[in-house]
């Protein structure tokens, strides 16, 4: 699968008797629950190469098929049969060519913030760092004084420029001056803690029960577009050739997912369901940010325990 500048090319093959088609699975659809695939292309040859428009209008949103995965189905009467693994984009068109930040030492610093100790970056001799980026602390659905408008998917969202300048730009600029590779830890608060409650309702997972952070809601097109817009804005701002606001080199998704009930909550779920949702979130970030920085990496987040079980009783699942 190749996501090019204005189209998506899917190449594959299949064998067997019957009617087959290529199915598109956007993040807001659960591939296991799909009875009749809503977005499909009929296959007439066992080996195929299909090129589709990358951007399509869906329910008032200009959806980017970069976010979709693709699979082969066999047509059924009541239910279509999934006959292949789903496949994400292998190649992603990059808008620009940023140089990679090479690590010069093993030494790093966790959770950098704007304070009087920033000058210690030099004396510490660090080569990497992390920074918490909680998107629900600066993103709004309606404009407020001092906001920056950002349009994605045909919808406009608003970002608190004062927050960005003081809490993110300052440490990221200082890190960029020293060629420190910074990884952003992406966090989503539950609706009750969000600066914009309406945004919180949109991004809080529908099965959230408790905990510090929620798994993002990716069950509707509206929520997916909003979540994707946050990544698009962050990558556009913090992946530039001149590092005008600082640089985010890598992305860490959420917090300690092995303790998901407290740190990335979506209720009590089978491990397979939780993992599938988590991978959707990771993939959405990866596919978007790699357009701006082809060297960017996306990492999973786990607890800091090496020899003992961490978060005992906090990673429950049904079998």
Which residue stretches match the model-derived regions?
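Short, solvent-exposed coil/turn segments at beta-strand boundaries
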Residues: 4-5, 124-125, 318
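N-terminal substrate-binding region of glycoside hydrolase catalytic domains
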Residues: 71, 77-235, 239, 243, ...
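Noncatalytic carbohydrate-binding groove/subsite architecture in carbohydrate-active enzymes
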Residues: 101, 230, 247, 274-319
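Alpha/beta-hydrolase-fold catalytic nucleophile elbow
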Residues: 254-255, 301
């Amino acid at each position: 699968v190749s996501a090019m500048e204005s189209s998506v090319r899917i190449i594959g093959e299949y064998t067997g008797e019957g009617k087959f088609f290529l199915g598109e699975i956007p993040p807001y659809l659960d591939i296991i629950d799909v009875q009749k695939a809503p977005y499909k292309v009929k296959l007439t040859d066992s080996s195929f190469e299909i090129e589709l428009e990358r951007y399509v209008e869906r329910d008032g949103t200009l959806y980017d098929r970069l976010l979709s995965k693709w699979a082969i189905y066999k047509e059924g009467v009541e239910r279509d049969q999934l006959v292949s693994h789903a496949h994400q984009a292998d190649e992603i068109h990059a808008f620009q060519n940023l140089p990679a930040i090479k690590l010069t030492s093993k030494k790093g610093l966790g959770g950098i913030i704007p304070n009087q100790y920033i000058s210690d970056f030099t004396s510490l001799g660090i080569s990497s760092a992390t920074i918490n980026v909680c998107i629900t602390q600066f993103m709004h659905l309606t404009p407020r004084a001092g906001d920056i408008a950002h349009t994605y998917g045909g919808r406009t969202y608003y970002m608190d420029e004062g927050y960005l300048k003081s809490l993110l730009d300052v440490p990221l600029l200082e890190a960029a001056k020293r060629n420190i590779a910074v990884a952003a830890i992406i966090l989503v608060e539950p609706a009750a803690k969000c600066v914009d409650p309406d945004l919180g309702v949109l991004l809080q997972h529908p099965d959230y029960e408790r905990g510090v952070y929620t798994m993002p809601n990716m069950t509707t097109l509206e929520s997916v577009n909003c979540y994707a817009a946050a990544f698009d804005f962050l990558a556009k701002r913090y992946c530039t050739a001149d590092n005008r606001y600082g640089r985010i080199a890598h992305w860490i998704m959420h917090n300690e997912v092995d303790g998901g009930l407290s740190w990335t909550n979506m209720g009590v779920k089978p491990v397979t369901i939780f993992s599938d949702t988590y991978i959707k979130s990771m993939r959405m970030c990866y596919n978007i940010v790699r357009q701006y920085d082809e060297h960017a990496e996306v990492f999973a987040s786990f607890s800091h325990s090496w020899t003992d079980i961490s978060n005992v009783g906090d990673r429950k699942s049904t079998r």
